[in-house]
């Protein structure tokens, strides 16, 4: 089920801002074989847990890349950290999601759990507010993992990139176990 976060971040268009398919639909194997792939940015896991492709998200809107490409982490602990130096674009009043803009202009959302907006902030603690500057490793959101597991559809943390350019996608480089701040994915370009 799509919660308010999805409609607040992007209005249901494809990740590239058109009505076409979402970013990340190119043939990765063909591009890799042709040598056309270029790594544009290494992405660190904001939470410890098991990293997986966004297509495995419990929420259909995220899994379908309606808001953009990304990845998920099934958390082992209830703390989300800043994966890099960035500006805090917004923190939802329900404290279940935070938007960041990196110093190099990449915008992304870190969303804790599925249908957690319905918890109205219960089980969450925000350590940042709109407009804050954060350094890599700073605490962003704390959450009671057991409470989330009991009261929400899923506790997975969804990291979705809302400003990818045409031809860019997220490639998971470390599926499976990821410690916080481990390189877990990359923004790659096939242009």
Where are the predicted features?
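Contiguous, well-folded functional domains in the mature portion of proteins
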Residues: 4-191
